[in-house]
Amino acid sequence: LLWLSEQQGVFNFLRRNSLARRFASRFVAGETSETATAAALDLKRLGITTSLDLLGESVTRDAEAIGARDEYLRMLDRLAASGAEINVSVKLTQMGFDIDEALCVDNMRRILTKARELGGFVRLDMEGSAYTQRTLDFFERHLLAEFSKHTGVVIQSCLRRSADDVTRLIGMGARVRLCKGAYLESPEVAFPDKQDVDRQYVALMEQ
């Protein structure tokens, strides 16, 4: 589930555009972290697992990355206090990955330390294919050993490389979540045919 929080440009567009608002309502749990938490709690009562994701990526300033980090820290506390599942998904570019890797490491470690204290889980979202290897390297180098019980990574079944990635991650004992992928990629990198994406999704799931 997504929540909008302080992503003001996106927030204003969705508020003004009724078509965009109807489309987004399928995926956006709430306009604030409070409403997103309530949605997550409702789904937990139905036996449905959730992971909350703050809408936004590719920040360009340290302050934006730190602000997103602090919003995640507040969300983890809010989820714990509410009784909802303590599970969030984070994009590295939102944590300053393209600004300064040390900043990104610090932000992610703070989020994961909080999640570990609360018995929660942090999923590393996968972005476009230009970030796939960098994200996996970051996950292995900075997070997996210390936070293995509280973190995992996403793999996209649309990418041709994903079978090898899943095999390697399983060998490391990493927790993998599969998705089909929503980024526009070249046919050299990703399967252009949905049937191939679906077929690989099933094959990866069975590994």
Give short role names for the model-derived ranges.
Residues 1-207:
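Positively charged, amphipathic and often flexible ligand-engagement surfaces
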